[in-house]
Amino acid sequence: RFKKIRRLGALPGLTSKRPRSGSDLKNQLRSGKRSQYRIRLEEKQKLRFHYGLTERQLLKYVHIAGKAKGSTGQILLQLLEMRLDNILFRLGMASTIPGARQLVNHRHILVNGRIVDIPSYRCKPRDIITTKNKQRSKALIQNFIASSPQQEELPNHLTIDPFQYKGLVNQIIDSKWIGLKIN
């Protein structure tokens, strides 16, 4: 995990740790000129590791984004940001996207009153995301919400009620709220 961060820069979805500033200078001195292939590969790897996708999943999302009207890159980022695991991460119900995936896989999360155990579930506007009405589920979410830093601003397409352990998807995400810098 830390090798990936050193190589690709900060990946907030993978871990809250940041690369040291000195290691970045060493990499720039050692690397020389970066080819177009290398730049594209690094950007693709950033997407994969930040969102926790396999190569095949990313290719499917690129294919869907290519068929849709509009900028393929923007639509791809919208598709990735509207995944259930990513929305839990953005709401602050999980510290990382892998942590959010585990919450979903262990059936702690309800979407519109139904258990969803698929982390790649594509959320739609007006979806209500809650925790299961069990003490253990609520305790897990409460720990994440309490330990998450409150200075992070919530994206305008999401709202959260931390006392009821409930989040709401208001609309499709705006491109300025995407936290990952992709070239």
Curated annotation (Swiss-Prot):
Its main location: plastid. GO terms for biological process: ribosomal small subunit biogenesis; translation. InterPro entries: Ribosomal_uS4, Ribosomal_uS4_bac-type, Ribosomal_uS4_CS, Ribosomal_uS4_N, S4_RNA-bd, S4_RNA-bd_sf. Residues 82-143 form the S4 RNA-binding domain. The keyword Transmembrane helix does not apply. GO terms for molecular function: rRNA binding; structural constituent of ribosome. Part of the 30S ribosomal subunit. Contacts protein S5. The interaction surface between S4 and S5 is involved in control of translational fidelity. This is Small ribosomal subunit protein uS4c. It comes from Schizorhiza neglecta (Lapeirousia neglecta). The lineage of its organism: Eukaryota, Viridiplantae, Streptophyta, Embryophyta, Tracheophyta. The gene is rps4.
